[in-house]
A protein has these predicted regions:
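C-terminal soluble interaction/assembly domains
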Residues: 383-447
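Structural motif corresponding to the intra-repeat A-B loop/turn of tetratricopeptide repeats
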Residues: 514-515, 547, 584
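Caspase-like cysteine protease fold
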Residues: 441-514
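Structured catalytic cores of large enzymes
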Residues: 123-325, 333, 457-471, 475
Length: 620
């Protein structure tokens, strides 16, 4: 045992004196959802929460012991998440303490749960500095504050204390902390037990290593299976499980290799108490961090209403098929929740000039740095939007507004994003399908990310408020946003002071048909004619096109084109009409349509996009 381990064990044993023994008998540790057994069970459109009562809880019980209302249950759940959150900041960053205080006030986290660390201001840190300036100080502080409960394991001949319970489950890292741990040489005499290109890699994101603070002495090389994950761990290039580069940890279970869509019942029954759900409150500016938090709070009250966009590459098989599959499932999950989804299935990323309007969610891939419409200076996501782009180095830096994807997406208004600080290999990346599904089920960002992340001690980070629940407003908890002073200015301009809101109406119609946009076709078409709103038909046409119902999609897009008065929407629907004809095997008709309606392209970038499409179709 090294000196650091001996010192920490000594501190642990001190806390296991009289106070620790008393706590082991009388304390009822607050449990946070899923990680520590709260057992949230949520369905689209409704939610129920079952959790262990914490000491001192004053929840109202009705006859038979049921909690009086679903809203009260969710309120308790949110409060317990806050009680189980620690906020970590860099004391060497002059703005970090202010951001930590701001976050604690906004999310009702007790300021006593802030933890300062003195770390370098650089994004990259050495493994030695991580251990001495982040890992060890946090472990000591968690022990000192009584966040962790230890017990001596009788079967351990060395009688070392083992972590058996915790009262924290979420960690918010404040802007200014290091982002990634640089690779280091294998020590003299050390061995590599995982023979693979990545089995010898000991680089990682700071966030991923912090999530494992309570799993002492874990191997540094390769990956560690995430016991919280419901996603498969697959060998890159293979559809089979049993990855030889998965680190073996005492008592750990290898995740099942399954591509089946997860349900709440698939959540792992036994989660190590030392596992933490970590998210990073980070942006290119401090104002960006504040906006991220405030936008999320407003969206939780009013709902996240807008289009979902997915950018596919039409790859069906092989390792890259996993990426397309996860994005496709994200889109289908949003559709089943009554959210209109627009998709791009061309091999390239969404082209510059393609109108991405009312963007509430985006999942796509694959280019090295932000491009297309997202890179345009005027582009903005809707407040509270979730935006994720799959690329090996999407989060190699968060400080450059034009490099990678994660930082730039946040700069353009997204409240949540996921990225990779170094090469993760596709089988170990976050499953966007599971992430989106979990968010739509009412879970917060941190829970959803860790459900979708197959491995830890690896390269991925979550940027956003860990407690943010983007779709809380879609689950029946929203307040009346039609008269709320915080209602979107854009929506107010479009539909007036007390408007008919087509986003809510669209969702209501789809959910009335069990979440099937295709089955709702007749009602959506009828509502479009009644309201003269193209949204119903554009969302329907996109679903029909993705389902291979191309003739029906063509009719829906044509009808949508006749209704819209918005120039950007008209140009986008033109492209969707032409692409549908191309997919039908009628590229000449698609090209003719683009030529006929060329006046809908209002800018040089849109005209350039039209020219590139005409060139492509003329070659088919």
């Amino acid at each position: 045992m090294d000196g650091r381990s001996q010192a920490l064990e000594s501190d642990v044993k001190k806390t296991m004196g009289v106070r620790g023994l008393i706590n082991s008998f009388v304390c009822r540790i607050t449990r946070v959802s899923l990680i520590l057994g709260m057992g949230m069970v949520v369905g689209v459109g409704m939610a129920s929460v079952n959790f262990e009562e914490a000491e001192g809880s004053n929840g109202t019980k009705g006859a038979g012991g049921a909690t009086s209302s679903r809203e009260e249950l969710m309120t308790k759940s949110i409060a317990r998440d806050a009680a189980a959150t620690v906020v970590i900041y860099n004391s060497n960053d002059p703005e970090a303490k202010g951001l930590a205080d701001f976050y604690c006030e906004a999310r009702h986290v007790d300021p006593s749960q802030e933890i300062p660390l003195a770390t370098p201001l650089s994004e990259e840190i050495s493994r030695a500095d991580f251990q001495s300036q982040i890992e060890e100080p946090l472990q000591r502080e968690f022990v000192r504050r009584g966040y962790w409960k230890f017990s001596i394991t009788p079967l351990d001949p060395d009688r070392r204390p083992a972590l058996v319970a915790t009262r924290i489950g979420f960690v918010a890292l404040i802007r200014g902390l290091p982002l990634k741990i640089a690779p280091c040489a294998i020590p003299v005499g050390g061995t590599i037990t995982q023979p693979s290109p990545y089995g010898s890699c000991n680089a990682a994101s700071v966030d991923s290593e912090i999530s494992l603070l309570g799993l002492f002495h874990h191997p540094l090389n390769g990956v560690i299976p995430n016991p919280y994950s419901v996603s498969p761990v697959l060998e890159p290039g293979s559809a089979k499980g049993g990855n030889p580069s998965v680190k073996k940890t005492k008592g750990g279970n290898s995740p099942a290799a399954s591509t089946s869509f997860p349900t709440s019942g698939n959540r792992r029954k036994s989660i190590p108490p030392g596992l933490l759900c970590v998210a990073r409150l980070d942006a290119t500016t401090t104002d960006g961090v504040r906006a991220m938090v405030l936008d999320g709070l407003r969206v939780e009250r009013e709902g996240l209403w807008g289009f979902g966009y997915i950018d596919l590459r039409s790859i069906k098989t092989g390792p890259y098929g996993l990426g397309d599959q996860s994005i496709r499932i994200a889109g289908e999950s949003m559709r089943r929740a009554g959210i209109p989804v627009l998709s791009d299935d061309l091999p390239e990323t969404i082209h510059a000039g393609f109108p991405v309007t009312d963007a509430a969610a985006y999942y796509g891939w694959y280019s090295g740095s932000i491009d297309g419409p997202f890179a345009e200076p005027s582009f903005r996501f809707l407040p509270g939007a979730v935006a994720c782009h799959l690329h090996s180095f999407s989060a190699s830096t968060l400080g450059d507004p034009a490099q990678g994807w994660t930082g730039p997406l946040v700069r353009h208004g997204a409240a949540a994003s996921i990225g990779n600080v170094y090469e993760p290999y596709i089988g170990f990346t976050t499953n966007f399908g599971i992430f989106a599904w979990s968010l739509l089920a009412g879970h917060n960002l941190a829970e959803s990310y860790y459900a979708a992340q197959p491995v830890l001690s690896w390269m991925t980070i979550l940027v956003g408020d860990p407690l943010y629940r983007p779709y809380l407003g879609l689950l029946g908890w929203e307040r009346d946003s039609h008269t709320s002073p915080g209602v979107s200015a854009t929506r107010s301009q479009k539909w007036g002071k007390n408007p008919h809101d087509p986003w809510r109406d669209y969702r209501r119609i789809v959910l009335a048909h069990r979440g099937s946009t295709l089955e709702a076709a007749s009602d959506l078409s009828h509502r479009a004619r009644e309201t003269h709103e193209s949204l119903y038909l554009e969302g329907l046409g996109a679903a029909q096109s993705d389902a291979g119902q191309l003739t029906k999609a063509e009719a829906s897009f044509n009808a949508a084109a006749s209704l819209t008065k918005d120039p950007d929407t008209a140009f986008r629907i033109l492209l969707e009409r032409a692409r549908t004809l191309e997919k039908e095997g009628k590229p000449a008709r698609g090209a003719a349509l683009l030529s006929k309606e060329i006046s809908l392209a209002r800018s040089d970038i849109q005209r350039a996009l039209l020219d590139s499409w005409l060139t492509r179709m003329s070659k088919l």
